[in-house]
Curated annotation (Swiss-Prot):
Bilayer disposition of the protein: Single-pass membrane protein
Species classification: Bacteria, Bacillati, Bacillota, Bacilli, Bacillales
Membrane-spanning residues: 112-132
Major site of localization recorded for this protein: membrane
Region (Disordered): 1-71, 139-174
Keyword check for Membrane: yes
Organism of this sequence: Bacillus subtilis (strain 168)
Compositional bias segments (type: Basic and acidic residues): 11-27
Protein name: Stage II sporulation protein B
Induction, per UniProt: Transcription is under sporulation control.
InterPro entries for this protein: SPOR-like_dom, SPOR-like_sf
One of the record's GO molecular function terms: peptidoglycan binding
Gene from which the chain derives: spoIIB
Length: 332
């Protein structure tokens, strides 16, 4: 036999809800879910377990879409335009041309430093070479003009190429000063070195004389010529014989005014003989005749010129150097 369900028990398990539809009132019963009934019948031993269970139930009933955050573009716009909002700091970019300028300056500094270093090294090596060269010091191209000067012989203008006017030459001759070009064979800090070189030159058949000056140096003069180019040619003859020589040095000599022409012409003939140029006997006799007409005594410049002309009566390179040696006696 089937037992009938107890309506009271079934109704008690349902919730009554009155609803009015089209003017008619009806009662609707909502049956509780098993889960609800299970929750109602759940018991807890302490408050901590109850609180934890409630949190788990609340978490399971949360809508999954609530985790997502919807950005409102309008609010974002207001945020950007709000003057109270301070924008984040951004580091300024450095200009590229500044780096390029710095980089371009470095090579210039390196080149300048290299040049300065080379100049210092070169100067040091030059001083070292001068110290080990002994007493002998090679003269610079302008050393003779800058240094030679005394009552007997003195340097002319520092520029060998400078030409004096006719009036200046006439005044110099009136004062007894004769300007010519010399061949410098050496410059020494003591007389002994100059005398040694002078002996070496004369032993080889060349002309030479030492001349001490007030600057503390002693110079070796190896020849005279009235023209600069001729003096340079005489210097080349010595260079070809393994001697050091510099021609074209302007030199002033103290000679009597009435003897300057004869001295000049005799020096020209001696240079021609050394360079193997033709010398006529008539040219030698002409100078001797002009000397005989002068009132100068047979000493000093006149004696030196006459002895030089005697050597040139039989012209040759050897005779030319001997004539030069006689003329160089005037330098002292």
């Amino acid at each position: 036999m089937k037992k009938r369900k107890n309506k009271k028990n079934s109704k008690a398990a349902e919730k009554a809800l009155k609803v009015t539809i089209n003017g008619k009132e009806e009662t609707v019963y909502e049956q509780e879910t098993p889960e609800t009934e299970a929750n109602k019948s759940m018991t807890f031993s302490n408050w901590e377990e109850k609180r934890q269970a409630e949190q788990e139930v609340a978490a399971s009933q949360e809508h999954p879409d609530e985790d997502e955050f919807n950005w409102d573009s309008e609010e974002d716009k207001v945020f950007k335009e709000d003057p109270k909002v301070v924008p984040p700091f951004q580091k300024k970019k450095t200009k590229l041309y500044a780096k390029g300028k710095t980089g371009a300056a470095k090579p210039v500094k390196r080149v300048a430093a290299t040049i300065a270093f080379a100049a210092v090294i070169g100067t040091g090596l030059g001083l070292f070479a001068l110290n080990i060269s002994g007493n002998k010091e090679a003269s610079a191209p302008a050393s003779l003009e800058d240094s030679l000067g005394s009552q007997t012989a003195k340097a002319g203008d520092t520029s060998a190429d400078k030409q004096t006017s006719g009036a200046e030459k006439q005044a110099a001759q009136t004062e007894g000063t004769y300007k010519t070009y010399a061949v410098q064979a050496g410059k020494f800090s003591n007389e002994k070195g100059a005398e040694t070189l002078t002996e070496q030159l004369t032993e080889k058949g060349y002309s030479a004389v030492s001349l001490s000056k007030d600057d503390g140096y002693t110079y070796v003069i190896a020849g005279l010529a009235s023209e600069k180019e001729v003096s340079q040619q005489l210097g080349q003859v010595l260079i070809d014989s393994d001697f050091e020589a510099w021609g074209g040095k302007e030199l002033s000599l103290s000679i009597e005014s009435d003897m300057t022409d004869s001295f000049k012409e005799t020096a020209e003939l001696a240079a021609k003989a050394i360079l193997d140029e033709d010398i006529t006997k008539a040219s030698v006799e002409k100078i001797e005749k002009s000397l005989g007409e002068t009132k100068a005594s047979e000493t000093g410049e006149k004696k030196a010129i006459l002895q030089a002309l005697k050597e040139l009566e039989d012209p040759s390179a050897e005779a030319g150097w001997k004539a030069q040696q006689e003329l160089l006696a005037v330098v002292k």
